[in-house]
Amino acid sequence: MTTSLVLHPRWADTLMYVYEKSPNENNQNKSQTMEGLSGNCPATHCRDLMSHPALGRHSGTIATHQGSVYSDISSPDTGRQCPAPQTSSSASLSYGYPFGNPYYGCRLSHSHNVNLQQKPCSYHPAEKYAEPSSALPTEELSSRAKEFAFYPSFASSYQAVPGYLDVSVMPSISGHPEPRHDALIPMEGYQHWALSNGWDGQVYCSKEQTQSTHLWKSPFPDVVPLQPEVSSYRRGRKKRVPYTKLQLKELEKEYAASKFITKDKRRRISAATNLSERQVTIWFQNRRVKEKKFISKSKSSHMHTT
């Protein structure tokens, strides 16, 4: 037998089953389910709608409403019915997802233990299933809202967060899933991905962080207190590197010749003393300040003596 699974994105998951008669099956097993067809559904084809197994106790609710929604659908066109394969000896189970126009189907072998509920047979063409984006009348929308207003979520385990869609994993067809108590939410109040704050909401992160400034004192003199790790990333003064005697001699000789250096002279001194041009410039600045202090100090001492 072949089974089609029709899943609506924003409605409850309904299953549409198609029974295809295989040569090795008995016609008496399906004779009771073919009584309500009145000639529209042949003995080898039967479509049935049942609720998704994950809906649990709400499956009966969908079954009561589906008769009023699809009661006016007729099937004069028998060309849309899937003919049973004459050469296949084993039936198969197929299900698909009609999201948009294409139909994606899968098939499972008949060896799986499929528990199917038998209901009165009816044929529903593919055009009768309205997509969520299509316009529907108000009366039909309200009736469909009562039928398909199931929102997969855990009603009692946690509080639902607005803006997040709870997607339940479909159980295996061959297994017997446990009944779930899903929350019943009206369809009119549903807003697709309506986030409360939005993804682009600004998050304020304070840059200032309080740090402990107290020093831990150990009773043992050999133990060195740990410094905070932030100090390693903080830019501080470089350790003073003293110049060698040869470097100082070269710098003093150039300073005696001229207290101010040019660009070419700075490059030449940098190459001769193996110092950077910045170091040479800073040394000349400090040397001028030192000489100025020495002159001012000598003048003050001379004025004090007189």
From Swiss-Prot:
One of its GO terms (cellular component) is nucleus. GO terms for molecular function: DNA binding; DNA-binding transcription factor activity, RNA polymerase II-specific. Keywords: Developmental protein, DNA-binding, Homeobox, Nucleus, Transcription, Transcription regulation. Disulfide bonds: none annotated. The keyword Nucleus applies. Pfam families: Homeodomain, HoxA13_N. Residues 236-295 bind DNA. It is found in: Nucleus. InterPro entries: AP_axis_regulatory_Homeobox, HD, Homeobox_CS, Homeodomain-like_sf, HoxA13_N. Residues 68-90 are annotated as: Disordered. Sequence-specific transcription factor which is part of a developmental regulatory system that provides cells with specific positional identities on the anterior-posterior axis. Belongs to the Abd-B homeobox family. This is Homeobox protein Hox-C13a. The lineage of its organism: Eukaryota, Metazoa, Chordata, Craniata, Vertebrata. The gene is hoxc13a.
